[in-house]
Regions:
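Short Pro/Gly-enriched beta-strand edge/turn motifs at strand-loop
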Residues: 230-236, 318-321
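Flexible, small-/acidic-enriched active-site or ligand-binding loops
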Residues: 315-341
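Low-complexity proline/serine/threonine-rich segments in eukaryotic and viral proteins
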Residues: 2-46
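Amphipathic, small/basic residue-rich leader segments at the start of a protein or domain
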Residues: 39, 47-220, 224-232, 242-243, ...
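Long, well-ordered alpha-helical segments
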Residues: 258-264, 308-312, 338-352, 356, ...
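A short core secondary-structure module
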Residues: 256-319
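Glycine- and acidic
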Residues: 186-190, 202-206, 268-272, 318-322, ...
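Secondary-structure capping and boundary motifs in well-ordered enzyme cores
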Residues: 152, 175-176, 197, 279, ...
Length: 440
């Protein structure tokens, strides 16, 4: 047998010298011990023994690394090649009915959930490849943000054509709401950017129109929102104020002569910041601003404002900037918005809680400003809840991946000739995963 040594620096292969070749048949020698000279500063380290015996020992050690495993069979050699098999194909059938457990965990609208999963399986936008069965392929997080954003919009277009969003804003009642939440959960376990983008459009923009507006707003915008004929975003957060909504600095001044509100960004900290959908796609937004009438500040109110035309060109006197690449959710186009004397009709004020009459008179069914502010924000709670619920979807997916992997991956063997042990048979994995699985 000719032994070959690869020399990386030269990029060539050379035959081992006779010393290395002869060492292949030698047993591994006892490791060489050296004198501890650290404790004696004046003592010099011993020189390497130049005799052939020392060289042979060194050569033997290197040769054993190069020679590979000995001829004697080992547990790893006698085993077939390691390969992956889904747990359901190798484990015994469960002692319970999986369909009944699924019904218990999902709770409601099982057929609607299955219909949506089927619609996603049929589209290469969601299921572009098959690998041992139907496989959902998650978004490519190595793709640039523009590519991820385009993928999100293509998926939304496909789901719109399939009628997934039908009734999400125009139908009312517990049945319609539960069906919508079931479908959102199905989407949430697949693509987080898609879920956030839909959440901004339906649960923030759409819910503001539905729950803060009145019939004139519903008739004008709800159906177009549901059909994605218009794309909405939600401009509440500012660079200087996020959670403290009462402190926002954008100003909407009522002009009684033209019966319009004039919206302005008075300073840099008043720019609308981190607004999902604003950077690329949104045509309209809900602007939260301090309402000024005849020099009096009536507090924060919401105004429907168009920011782009139908070909997605930004309108005059509106400046929009991209928040750029993020550590996650790059399929969502977060942006920044500045307003410079943007005029919107009086009718664009969402007036369920308070209104402004044509002559500039401010009217409200709630006299106390604190109660009025609370009533103004309460319909928006659902959007906040949905963001928290997304963490539950992600936890479900993470736990499923971890358990399936632990039932497939093996590491180390208890006996010399036995199979390697499943990860889930290790107590450390059991303590981490099984309590979470039991609480699912």
């Amino acid at each position: 047998m000719k032994s070959v040594l690869l020399i990386p620096e030269l990029g060539t292969s050379r035959k081992l010298p006779p010393l290395f070749s002869s060492a292949l048949s030698h047993p591994l020698p006892v490791p060489i011990t050296t004198t501890n000279y650290v404790d004696s500063p004046n003592q010099t380290p011993p020189l390497m023994d130049p005799t052939p015996t020392a060289a042979a020992r060194r050569a033997a050690a290197i040769a054993r690394h190069l020679a590979g495993l000995p001829s004697a069979a080992t547990a790893l050699q006698s085993s077939p090649c390691l390969s992956y098999a889904p747990p359901e194909s190798t484990e015994a059938p469960p002692a319970f009915a999986p369909t009944e457990l699924r019904a218990l965990l999902d709770g409601h609208h099982l057929r609607d959930r299955d219909w949506l999963f089927g619609a996603m399986e049929e589209s290469p936008l969601f299921c572009p490849r098959r690998a041992g069965g139907k496989v959902f392929v998650s978004p490519d997080y190595n793709e640039g943000k523009e590519g991820q954003r385009e993928a999100t919009m293509r998926r939304i277009g496909y789901l719109t054509r399939r009628g997934v969003f039908r009734g999400w804003l125009t139908e009312a009642g517990p049945e319609a709401e539960l069906r919508k939440l079931a479908l959102v959960e199905c989407l949430g376990v697949y693509d987080h950017s898609l879920t956030i983008k839909l959440g901004v459009h339906f649960f923030l923009w759409g819910s503001a129109i539905k729950f803060l507006g009145t019939k004139r707003h519903h008739d004008k915008w709800l159906l177009d929102t549901e059909n994605y004929a218009m794309k909405g975003c939600f401009a509440m957060t500012e660079l200087g104020h996020g959670s403290n909504v009462r402190g926002i600095e954008t100003i909407a001044t009522y002009d009684s002569k033209t019966r319009e509100f004039v919206i302005n960004t008075p300073c840099e900290s008043a720019q609308k910041y981190w607004i999902g959908g604003a950077a690329n796609n949104a045509t309209h937004t809900i602007v939260f601003a301090q309402l000024h009438i005849n020099g009096r500040n009536e507090g924060v109110h919401a105004f429907v404002t168009q920011i782009r035309d139908q070909d997605e060109s930004v309108l005059p006197n509106i400046h929009i900037a991209d928040c750029g690449h993020k550590i996650g959710l790059n399929g969502v186009d977060n942006g920044r918005i500045w307003f410079n004397n943007i005029r919107v009709p009086r009718e664009n004020l969402l007036n369920l809680v308070a209104d402004v009459l044509p002559d500039g008179q401010y009217v409200s069914t709630i006299d106390d400003p604190d109660q009025r502010f609370a009533a103004f924000l309460s319909p928006l709670t659902l959007g906040r809840v949905n963001i928290a619920v997304n963490a539950v979807y992600i936890s479900k997916v993470s736990l499923a991946i971890a358990v399936r992997y632990a039932l497939s991956r093996r590491a180390f063997s208890i006996t010399a000739d036995g199979p390697e042990t499943l990860l889930l048979d290790y107590p450390s994995h059991q303590r981490r995963l099984l309590p979470l699985l039991a609480k699912a």
